[in-house]
Each structure stands twice: as structure tokens, then as C-alpha cells.
Regions:
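Non-catalytic, solvent-exposed segments at the cell envelope interface
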Residues: 2-344
């Protein structure tokens, strides 16, 4: 879906690194990027150092695991405009448990064009998870093996190499939403989650703003006719609602609080210097373009469990989009894009 100029100005890289993008927006509109560098970049970098968690990846030739080779700062700077893939994981965990990736979003970032392609994969999608003896839900990959296995699983499913990941605990979103005074959500009727096998809650319709708890329950709601696909679309609405509210609040004094929230709930294998450089690159341009799509398919029981079966034609279309978007020489105007009507 193509955003308006006002909305796109708030996006930055937030669809891929949501909390940093939200912070970056405020610096652009309230203090400018120069003031950001002067007053807050050191604090942000310190929190990013805390959040930097490279993952161990299998080395195909030796069969032994290894950490992805890091580029030197010079190599990274020279490669700053290269399109790359980012797997965004929204983690729903309670207490000290690892949790599952309730949001699985593949993003192609084109820094030179300040453009994003976002593909949401329903969490119950039936896939082959490396190391497991039978197919399972894509959300379970993170529970079994953390970000590394999630990256490997999604890459295998879409026949591509995932360059980077970013994971955000949903409790971090809740704290962000409360810090900015709630968000607007298009809830026309009460959402009642009361199935015996589900967490019980009610989200009242028609509220002017929804607090963090209600907003997360909006994302977690499971009992509508659209099932897992509807849930994935609500995740996109949820992210956009956070960014829309951020564009209105404009209170830069809240930024230190948001930086602290980011440090506690955010993890990525992108080095801190690269994150800051990418944020500045994406924020320094004019209007930005964000195109989104939710993988099509249907849900049904299989082997005693409920799965979402991806539509093969749509999955092939998504793979073709991603390959095209990763072509650094391609012009944005010539790239295939999702139909906005399909993402509404």
C-alpha cells in the first residue's frame, strides 16, 4: 500500500526496525538530524550495542555453525545503498520464556530509494523447519531455535537468503503505545476473545485511543472469520497506527524513555553504526514509499493441528517480487508492487 507523504514521513525504517524509526521521525521533525547527532546519538548507539545480537548460521561446506562475517566500516559504508532483506519478528513472550514469533514479516529495504516492500507471513503457515522431523508452524521456529532458526526457516520457505533480522518483544510495543498516549484503531465492534483454548479478553469498539494492552489484544485477537490472515493484516494496521500517532505527538522529551524501551525489548544482528547510518539515509530523503502484502492462503486442520497453507501461486509471486526488489540496478518505478486493494 502506498502511503501519503505525511504518513510516509513517519515511516523511515520503522517497518523493519520499528522503534528506531519512530525515534528517528521525531528527530527529523523536532530537532533535525543535526540535533539528533548532538544530543542523543550516543545514547541511541549505547542502547543499540545492548541490542546487537549476531546469530549463528550453519556453514554449508563444513557443516559447522559460524557467525556471519562482518564487514569492515569501510565496506559497510561502500555498501550502504545495496538493497537487503530484513526479517522482522514480533515476539510474544511472558516472563523469562523465549516465546514465539507471532509476527513474521519479510522486508526488502532499498535505502537509495527510501522504499520498503513488506510481506507478512501468517504465523500458522505450515513450513518445513530445519532439524524437525515433520512440518510445523512458522511461528514455532523461533521457539525452537531463536532468531537463527527463524531466519533459516523463512529463507528456506521463500528460497532466499535473509540478510538481517530484528526482533521486538510485544511488551515493548505496549510500553511505547502507553508512552505516546495510545493509538487509533479501526475497531467497529467489540473484539471478544472467549474461546476455551484462547486467552480471554474484550477490546471495546469505538474508543478514540487504545492503550498498550488493548492494542496488543487487537493484534492477538483470534476469533474472527479471517483467521490467521486477518491477524497478519491487523499487525500491519497496528504498526502503521503507532507511526501515525508518533507523527502527531511531536514531544521530543519522550525520546529518552523510548530509547530505554528499545534497549530492553529490541534485538538485531545489524551493527549499531549500520543502524544509525541506515536510519539517517532513510530519513534524509523526501517522501518514502511502503508497499505491503499479506501472503494468501487458507487454514485447515491437518494431523490434529490447525495450519495456514500458503497459496502456491501467491508464494511464487512474492518470491518474484523480492528477487526484483533486491536488484540494485532496477528503478523503483519499474519494480513489481502489490495491489493496494489486496492489502486494504
Amino acid at each position: 500500500m502506498r502511503l501519503t507523504r505525511r504518513k510516509a514521513r513517519a515511516v523511515g525504517i520503522a517497518a523493519g526496525i520499528a522503534l528506531l524509526g519512530l525515534i528517528g521521525y521525531w528527530f527529523r521533525t523536532q530537532l533535525t538530524l543535526a540535533a539528533f547527532d548532538l544530543f542523543f546519538s550516543g545514547r541511541v548507539k549505547a542502547q543499540l550495542e545492548q541490542s546487537y545480537q549476531p546469530i549463528v548460521r550453519p556453514a554449508p561446506e563444513s557443516g559447522e555453525a559460524s557467525v556471519r562475517k562482518e564487514e569492515s566500516p569501510e565496506e559497510a559504508a561502500a555498501d550502504a545503498d545495496r538493497p537487503f532483506t530484513l526479517l522482522l519478528l514480533g515476539i510474544d513472550s511472558r516472563g523469562n520464556e523465549r516465546g514465539r514469533s507471532d509476527a513474521v514479516i519479510v522486508t526488502v529495504v532499498r535505502p537509495r530509494d527510501a522504499a520498503l516492500l513488506i510481506v507478512s507471513i501468517p504465523r500458522d503457515t505450515r513450513v518445513d523447519i530445519p532439524g524437525r522431523d515433520k512440518p510445523d508452524k512458522i511461528a514455532h521456529a523461533y521457539a525452537y531455535g531463536g532468531a537463527g532458526l527463524a531466519v533459516e526457516t523463512v529463507g528456506k520457505f521463500l528460497d532466499l537468503d535473509i540478510d538481517h533480522y530484528a526482533s521486538i518483544n510485544f511488551r515493548g510495543f505496549r510500553e511505547v503505545i502507553d508512552a505516546i498516549g495510545g493509538i487509533r484503531l479501526p475497531i467497529a465492534k467489540d473484539l471478544v476473545n472467549d474461546d476455551p483454548g484462547h486467552e480471554h479478553f474484550v477490546v471495546k469498539a469505538g474508543q478514540p485511543f487504545y492503550n498498550g494492552e488493548d492494542a496488543l489484544n487487537y493484534v492477538r485477537f483470534r476469533e474472527d472469520a479471517g483467521g490467521d490472515a486477518s491477524r497478519a493484516k491487523r499487525q500491519q494496521i497496528f504498526l502503521r497506527a503507532i507511526l501515525d500517532k508518533a507523527s502527531e505527538v511531536g514531544e521530543w522529551r519522550k525520546i529518552p524513555e523510548l530509547i530505554d524501551i528499545m534497549g530492553k525489548n529490541f534485538a538485531t544482528d545489524i551493527r549499531p553504526d549500520e543502524v544509525l547510518r541506515l536510519a539517517e539515509r532513510m530519513l534524509a530523503g523526501g517522501s518514502r514509499a511502503v508497499y505491503s502484502h499479506t501472503l494468501k492462503g487458507a487454514g485447515r486442520m491437518d494431523g490434529g493441528a490447525w495450519y495456514f497453507f500458503a497459496d502456491e501461486r501467491d508464494a511464487e509471486r512474492v518470491k518474484a517480487w523480492i528477487r526484483a526488489w533486491l536488484d540494485a540496478d532496477a528503478k523503483l518505478r519499474d519494480l513489481p508492487k502489490p495491489d493496494p486493494a489486496e492489502s486494504a
